[in-house]
């Protein structure tokens, strides 16, 4: 009997409490692998998003009731990183079939608010490359993303940043 760790499906990176950046991964490969290893009598830990765990394929195979399956639900790349850190080291085989997002939202702003902030900066005589770059990368006009952002914001801009790279941390 082997101990297998499998990741499956997409990661979700939230812009606000309802909008997210994700990808088209269904998690099918990870679910199929999980099914086959469980059929062989192996112990499987599956790290996956709710969309995979609650998906029709997962239920059709009756995976949720298998005593040899440990499910670790995650949503974001950071969640997956933490789960992998907690689980790593005690497995015979690790299969990373998850489609992890490359970017996550850092903050949001409206073009109008950014234009006002830049005009103010220029009027104060702060027109150096460093001043402008600092304003663009850390503006005062950030939209509060702790709640739902209004769907009436015509010029909403989302600044993305890189997510944690997981493969190098698995080694």
Question: What do the PLM-derived regions correspond to, one by one?
Answer:
Residues 1-171:
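A cross-family phosphate/adenosyl-ligand binding-site feature
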């Amino acid at each position: 009997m082997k101990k297998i760790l499998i990741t499956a499906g997409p990661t979700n990176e939230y812009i606000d409490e309802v909008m997210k950046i994700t990808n088209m991964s269904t998690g099918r490969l990870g679910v199929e692998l999980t099914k086959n290893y469980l059929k062989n009598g192996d112990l499987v830990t599956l790290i996956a998003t709710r969309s995979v765990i609650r998906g029709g394929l997962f239920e059709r195979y009756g995976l949720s009731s298998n005593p040899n399956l440990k499910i670790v639900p995650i949503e974001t790349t950071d969640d997956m990183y933490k789960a992998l850190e907690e689980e790593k080291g005690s497995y015979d085989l690790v299969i990373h079939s998850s489609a992890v997002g490359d970017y996550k939202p850092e903050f949001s702003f409206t073009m109008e608010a950014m234009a006002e902030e830049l005009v103010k900066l220029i009027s104060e005589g702060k027109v150096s490359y460093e001043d402008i770059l600092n304003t663009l990368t850390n503006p005062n006009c950030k939209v509060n993303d702790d709640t739902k952002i209004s769907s009436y914001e015509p010029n909403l801009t989302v600044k993305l940043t890189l997510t944690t790279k997981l493969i190098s941390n698995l080694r």
